[in-house]
């Protein structure tokens, strides 16, 4: 037997989260089914758990399989993808040590949150958070507060059984995308509103729903100077502006670092 790591993307709108479910409608369930079809019967172990509606650009899972597949990873990838398409796509397979654990060996994870400012579009509804307008300067001031090592008790879903609520955020910043080819000109002279706001986070780990709660609070904070000052004051006292997380459809697990 050997252990392999699968790197893959998935459309989270089609599943009830990533972790296996009793009704077999989770990402891991679909992946396990596909592996069973190619003769691999051990269940996968994943690096991160994502909620219903959350997507992944590069999730990592491990599974044990027979030595038959050693040096046949491209063939294995193609075989698995036949059974996971169109909502899960295996991008890479590699052999790892027997001691490797995709969750506990990860040193960092990054997430992306996409906010769409144009008119509502039913074809984008599963992939972005519709939000009419925001102040990018205030948003980045709010996001900067998250950087560093903090107790994120106010920013996670209670009852998820975490041993520690302390996490270290390495990066938290937003940028905007404009329709015009000359985005810098448009941003400088405010000739049009941005189409998208992209928020990127990187940390040594995240609590359940932490990213969505951080986004929700940052969006509340950027509504006005008063809200921003209140958020800054409340953050020191561990009092969030809201306990309602932002919608899951705009969130993407971007990368797991080892």
Swiss-Prot record:
The keyword Ion transport does not apply. Gene3D superfamilies: Pseudouridine synthase I, catalytic domain, C-terminal subdomain, Pseudouridine synthase I, catalytic domain, N-terminal subdomain. One of its GO terms (molecular function) is RNA binding. CDD domains: PseudoU_synth_EcTruA. It is an enzyme of class 5 (isomerase). Keywords: Isomerase, tRNA processing. The active site is at 51 (nucleophile). It catalyses: uridine(38/39/40) in tRNA = pseudouridine(38/39/40) in tRNA. Substrate binds at residue 111. The keyword Isomerase applies. Belongs to the tRNA pseudouridine synthase TruA family. Formation of pseudouridine at positions 38, 39 and 40 in the anticodon stem and loop of transfer RNAs. Homodimer. This is tRNA pseudouridine synthase A. It comes from Campylobacter fetus subsp. fetus (strain 82-40). The gene is truA.
């Amino acid at each position: 037997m050997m252990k392999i790591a699968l790197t893959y993307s998935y459309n989270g709108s089609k599943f009830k989260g990533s972790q296996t479910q009793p009704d077999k409608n989770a990402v891991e369930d679909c992946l396990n089914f596909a592996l069973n079809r190619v003769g691999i019967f051990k269940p996968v172990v994943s690096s991160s758990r994502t909620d219903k509606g959350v997507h992944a650009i590069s999730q990592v899972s491990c599974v044990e399989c027979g030595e038959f597949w050693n040096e046949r990873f491209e063939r294995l990838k193609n075989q698995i993808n036949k059974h996971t398409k169109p909502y899960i796509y295996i991008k890479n397979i590699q052999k790892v040590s027997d001691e490797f654990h995709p969750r506990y060996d990860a040193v960092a994870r990054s997430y992306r949150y996409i906010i769409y400012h144009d008119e509502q579009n039913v074809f984008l509804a599963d992939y972005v958070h519709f939000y009419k307008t925001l102040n990018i300067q205030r948003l980045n001031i709010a996001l900067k507060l998250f950087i560093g090592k903090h107790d994120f008790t106010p920013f996670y879903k209670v009852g998820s059984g975490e041993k520690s609520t302390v996490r270290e955020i390495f990066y938290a910043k937003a940028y905007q995308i404009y329709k015009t080819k000359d985005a810098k000109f448009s941003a400088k002279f405010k000739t049009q509103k941005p189409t998208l706001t992209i928020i990127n986070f990187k940390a040594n780990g995240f609590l359940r729903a932490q990213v969505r709660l951080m986004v929700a609070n940052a969006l509340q904070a950027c509504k006005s100077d008063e809200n921003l000052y209140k958020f800054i004051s409340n953050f020191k006292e561990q009092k969030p502006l809201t306990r309602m997380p932002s919608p899951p459809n705009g969130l993407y697990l971007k990368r797991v670092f080892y």
